[in-house]
Regions:
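Extracellular/periplasmic periplasmic-binding protein-like sensory domains
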Residues: 251-329, 406
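Extracellular/periplasmic Venus flytrap/periplasmic-binding protein
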Residues: 134-136, 141-253, 300-304
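Bacterial Sec-dependent N-terminal signal peptides
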Residues: 9, 14-31
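Beta-alpha junction/loop-to-helix N-cap segments that form part of ligand/metal-binding clefts
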Residues: 32, 45-52, 64-139, 146-147, ...
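Segments of small-molecule ligand-sensing domains
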Residues: 312-326, 336-395
Length: 411
């Protein structure tokens, strides 16, 4: 109830700020949103938690309208993409043909978003997303807003941890796609003028399954770097999606890789697949595998609204949502507030007011202020590690990268 009351206050404040126009548009009472997510594929944990966040946000949004006697109601149509760009494109096209012009949450990654961006821009279809972070999609004045920071910030967090750990050489093992190339390029930029290098590393095509071969090749690069800097000064940077568990499992028993440090990326954090693969979990725990993701709060403190929402999503899905899935909740709420101010469901009109809504919006404990490219301006990053607990393994918060100040705070 407190959650609904707080958002109701925000809702009424935005209504009070609504401009009075000389021409009044017909009221559209049934606003349909669209969400393109992986709901049954290899990366469905993210999609299912994002969907649950969207559903909870719509329940809250509709409760607010009901509380003030408004007939307006929001709903959402979903497309299951399996992270396949062809399915993503067809899903967006079908939504457009059905009259939907507002997308929330998805697409589920940067490669998918890149695939549909031309269609979104050409057809004035607005996407308020929270799962894409590639810097190559940081484009001003398009029809995409991203409620998460781009990977230049994530690279800054990783670089700060590399320096904190006194690592001298980073060996990327990464997806050869929009996301993987973008994050590695950002890491190379972060290394300039700092006391570490980023090796060209080993790339692999999405869908590759030759994990042992790729891991062995990575071990060769680690051995070369260790000869120059010492084994404790070398780190592997894993930039993967669901493949993380397979690579970690393949590395188990490799003496060279067992002596290196291991970092991951935001797409690895809190994934059950790493915990349920015994070999992966054992290796990750042994080498202190840590991975950062945009944080809501810090490693030691999650704001109450975010913690409450996380519990609700976990009850619905069985998964602990990450900060990106939680952000799907805000995507819906921001869309609703923008609709109230614009007085219209027209995507172009909503697009013009989203930045001002985001500048004032901070419900979960994270500012949603956007930069000139329409991405989240800044945020802390929380590093997570895998550790043993009882008879199994868990993800546990480890440290916080404080973006304002560019430093690491251990939990």
């Amino acid at each position: 109830m407190k959650r609904i009351f707080l958002l109701s206050v925000i809702f009424l404040c935005f209504l009070a700020c609504r401009k009075s126009d000389s021409v009044v548009e017909p009221v559209q009472n049934n606003i349909r949103l669209g969400a393109v997510l992986d709901l049954s594929g290899d990366y469905s944990q993210e999609g299912l938690t994002g969907k649950a966040a969207i559903e909870l946000a719509i329940e809250s949004l509709n409760a607010r309208y009901a509380s003030v006697g408004s007939p307006v109601r929001f709903s959402c149509v979903y497309a299951d993409t399996h992270m396949d760009t062809n399915l993503t494109k067809s899903g967006v096209k079908e939504m457009y043909d059905a009259g939907i012009r507002l997308l929330v949450g998805g697409p589920g990654n940067s490669t998918e978003l890149k695939a549909v961006k031309p269609f979104l821009d050409a057809n004035r279809m607005l996407a308020i997303t929270c799962f894409s972070s590639s810097p190559s999609l940081s484009v001003a004045d398009d029809y995409i807003y991203r409620l998460i920071t781009d990977d230049n910030v994530q690279a800054g967090a990783l670089a700060a941890m590399v320096l904190h750990d006194s690592v001298r050489a980073v060996i990327p093992l990464f997806r050869d796609d929009t996301y993987g190339r973008g994050l590695v390029t950002a890491m190379v930029e972060q290394s300039r003028g700092k006391n570490f290098i980023v090796n060209p590393g080993i790339s692999f095509k999405p869908g590759s399954t030759n994990y042992q071969e790729l891991t062995a090749r990575t071990a060769g690069l680690v051995a070369e770097a260790a000869a120059a800097y010492g084994a404790s000064k070398v780190a592997v940077l894993l930039v993967t999606y669901q493949e993380a568990s397979e690579f970690l499992s393949a590395a188990q028993g490799n003496e060279i890789l067992g002596k290196a440090r291991w970092y991951g990326c935001d797409a690895n954090v809190q994934k059950e697949s790493v915990l349920t693969n015994t070999g992966a979990a054992e290796f990750a725990s042994a080498v202190r595998f840590i991975a950062p993701i945009m944080g809501i709060g810090t490693a030691g403190m999650i704001p109450a609204p975010a913690a409450e929402l996380s519990d609700l999503i976990r009850a619905k899905t069985g998964y602990i949502p990450d900060a990106y899935a939680l952000s799907a909740y805000d995507a819906v709420q921001i869309c609703g507030l923008a609709y109230d101010i614009a007085g219209s469901a027209d995507a172009g009109k909503i697009r013009t007011v989203v930045p001002s809504v985001c500048s004032a919006y901070n419900y979960l404990g994270i500012s949603r202020k956007l930069n000139a490219a329409g991405d989240l301006a800044t945020a802390n990053y929380i590093f997570w590690r895998v550790r043993a607990e009882g008879l199994g393994f868990i993800w546990d918060s480890y440290a916080t990268y404080m973006a304002e100040g560019n430093y690491i705070v251990l939990k």
